[in-house]
Amino acid sequence: MDGCFSVLSVVTKPGDGVIIQNPVYPPFYASTKNCGCNIILNPLKCEDCNYMMDYDHLESLFNGTQPKPKVFILCSPHNATGRVWSKEELQRLFDILIKHDCFIISDEIHFDIVRSGFKHHTVGTFGKEVEQRMALLTAASKTFNLAGLRTSYVVIPNDEIRDAYKKFRTGRSGGNYFG
């Protein structure tokens, strides 16, 4: 989760709000807290054993919530529910986030592990408006069972944010010999 922490460190300041959709992979909480940010929960709704995003609740978080949400952490496909978001679901989500100028950190480490009949849609395929306010995090470790590799990569299309990220990472631990 070093990538998530590093991106949060670049795009937030202590006290900023970060939206997390629970239930979710617990290290998202630690990364957010370690940056001094406030966790704002947007719980997933479970209907007929199927988890869904609560768009109305998400929209309400931008109207009066203090601190105003600055970052949204997306887990796609979702860990812990296994939910693969449809293109339409993601587009609706991104429309809300763009409207409120909210940065997107998309953890897509399970992108290559989806059940038959489902298709993963990466955050980087939703156009320039999304692309300029996103960071995609992923790694080979899940797909190829290489957890010990402990190496991941981050895609940040926005030049200014990518430069700040590289500056933040300078002098910090790099990859191992195999990564």
Identify the role of each PLM range:
Residues N34-I39:
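A short helix-loop-beta submotif of the ANL/AMP-binding
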